[in-house]
């Protein structure tokens, strides 16, 4: 990362503009309270105690010598928005459980640790996601949502603050653990590289709010995710180590409005020389590994939308030193209803709210395929990430409205899009109760009055791509016995009845 730039010391307006921007952050609720921080820190500390007890119990089950049982250890490392210090009051916690070589993910993590967590009074809504790219346990601890993946290192004991950048701990680990560790390693690299942690955190809070308001935030919809935004913010901070917050935010939009994509954004230049063309339309290199890039779902449509918003952001912030400048325009909600004539309406429903959460999470994990198909049929599509609820419908539902750029549309073409998408949804291994999908085309004039961005009808909590292991009549509790202590039950696993399989979604 090159260092350069400087603070505009000759302009008192710069300080005034930064004060105004910080006040906006407070007004928007971007700064969590001290109580929020204490509560989250308490959750992490409790989880660390739990996994230490868990791993010692696992060591005993594996019949390790007493001295090794006493010495072994596991730990919890927070990452994501909480690890970077940019979480909000509604944010969840991404926390990685790191265990030693003998603690397996299949038996010890997903069964033994899951049952230990489930027995805790602070834990509720515990789900397991085994088939995802990042297998994890998801639950609420004292009301705070926690995503807990697992990585296994080839050592007996994990230091409490293990250095995940140290090659000693990374030797001979499996591919799943390597992928999971990449997020934690990226966090640590970013925090080491930025010249001012406080300014980086403030800048990242601002650009994430901007991305959400302008509809360009969310990996599942083909936009920028949290790690993308963090690297872009760190990149700008590295070029202006002495800048004010307002100068950094204006320079953020100047930099990426003029960026020559697909030139990759690289924090550590020349550290890992590239041997081939970087992947994707907007390649952003992870700062912690050779030739590793952020996972990207950006398509032709979303690329154009992101670039357009960078340009608009630059036009809105280039005069930030002028008298009476206001930051509010930068964070205006995107005017979907005034921009597009036609919309693809995606209506998802289920029998109850819990089933709906699982169903929406599964369907959203297939959204990129739907977006590409719509692009083939209709051209440019703007997949608004906002989740709406049709309050006049009794059945629990979530609705999406994706803008289409064409002025005239062949309505019958939606049938081919629908058939193709249903095949994709049915081709996976969804473990929950199958819901319902309806794909239709509607005009902007047909949008519900409260269906526009910024309405009170917006769902506050975005549904995650997670589906639970069902705990209903379609499942049986099957005891799982230790491989090392015959007759010793380590926990119970949910097994889906065969007759419940083979269900397909229909419109």
UniProtKB/Swiss-Prot annotation:
Subunit structure: Monomer. Forms a complex with cleavage and polyadenylation specificity factor (CPSF) subunits FIPS5 and CPSF30.
Name of the protein in question: Nuclear poly(A) polymerase 3
InterPro entries: NT_sf, NuclTrfase_I-like_C, PolA_pol_cen_dom, PolA_pol_NTPase, PolyA_polymerase
Annotated ATP binding sites: 79-81, 91-94, 147, 208, 217, 226-227
Family listed: Belongs to the poly(A) polymerase family.
Lineage: Eukaryota, Viridiplantae, Streptophyta, Embryophyta, Tracheophyta
UniProt organism field: Arabidopsis thaliana (Mouse-ear cress)
Catalytic activity from the UniProt record: RNA(n) + ATP = RNA(n)-3'-adenine ribonucleotide + diphosphate
Signal peptide (UniProt feature, chain positions): none
Subcellular location as annotated: Nucleus
């Amino acid at each position: 990362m090159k260092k350069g730039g400087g603070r505009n010391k000759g302009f008192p307006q710069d300080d005034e503009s930064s004060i105004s921007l910080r006040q906006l952050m407070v007004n928007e609720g971007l700064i969590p309270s001290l109580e929020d921080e204490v509560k989250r820190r308490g959750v992490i500390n409790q989880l660390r105690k739990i996994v230490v007890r868990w791993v010692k119990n696992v060591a005993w089950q594996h019949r390790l010598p007493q001295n090794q049982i006493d010495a072994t250890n596991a730990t919890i490392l927070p990452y994501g928005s909480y690890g970077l210090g940019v979480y909000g009051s509604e944010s969840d916690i991404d926390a990685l459980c790191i265990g030693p070589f003998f603690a397996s993910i299949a038996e010890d993590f997903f069964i033994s640790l899951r049952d230990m967590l489930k027995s805790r009074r602070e834990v509720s809504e515990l789900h397991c996601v085994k088939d995802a790219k990042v297998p994890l346990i998801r639950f609420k601890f004292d009301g705070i949502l926690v995503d807990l993946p697992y990585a296994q290192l080839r050592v007996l004991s994990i230091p409490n603050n293990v250095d995940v950048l140290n090659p000693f701990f990374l030797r001979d680990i499996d591919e799943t653990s390597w992928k999971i560790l990449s997020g934690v390693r990226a966090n640590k690299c970013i925090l080491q590289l930025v010249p001012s942690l406080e300014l980086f955190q403030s800048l990242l809070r601002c650009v994430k709010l901007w991305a959400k308001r302008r509809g360009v935030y969310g990996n599942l919809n083909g936009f920028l995710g949290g790690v993308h935004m963090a690297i872009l913010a760190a990149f700008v901070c590295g070029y202006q180590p002495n800048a004010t917050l307002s100068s950094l935010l204006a320079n953020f939009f100047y930099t990426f409005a003029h960026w020559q994509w697909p030139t990759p954004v690289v924090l550590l230049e020349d550290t890992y020389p590239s041997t081939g063309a970087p992947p994707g339309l907007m390649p952003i290199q992870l700062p912690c590994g050779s030739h590793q890039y952020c996972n990207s779902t950006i398509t032709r449509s979303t690329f154009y939308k992101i670039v357009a918003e960078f340009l608009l952001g630059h036009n809105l912030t280039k005069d930030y030193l002028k008298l009476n400048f206001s930051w509010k325009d930068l964070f205006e909600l995107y005017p979907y209803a005034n921009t597009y004539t036609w919309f693809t309406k995606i209506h998802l429903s289920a029998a109850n709210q819990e089933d709906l959460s699982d169903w929406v999470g599964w369907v959203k994990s297939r959204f990129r395929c739907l977006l590409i198909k719509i692009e083939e049929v209709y051209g440019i599509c703007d997949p608004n990430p906002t989740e709406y609820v049709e309050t006049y419908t009794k059945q629990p539902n979530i609705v999406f409205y994706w803008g289409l750029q064409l002025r005239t549309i062949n309505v019958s073409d939606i049938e081919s899009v629908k058939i193709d998408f249903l095949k994709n949804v049915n081709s996976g291994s969804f473990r929950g109760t199958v819901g319902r999908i309806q794909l239709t085309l509607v005009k902007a004039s047909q949008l519900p009055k409260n269906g526009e961005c910024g309405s009170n009808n917006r769902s506050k909590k975005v549904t995650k791509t997670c589906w639970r292991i069902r705990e209903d009549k379609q499942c049986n509790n099957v005891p799982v016995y230790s491989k090392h202590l015959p007759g010793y039950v380590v926990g119970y696993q949910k097994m889906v009845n065969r007759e419940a399989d083979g269900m397909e979604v229909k419109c």
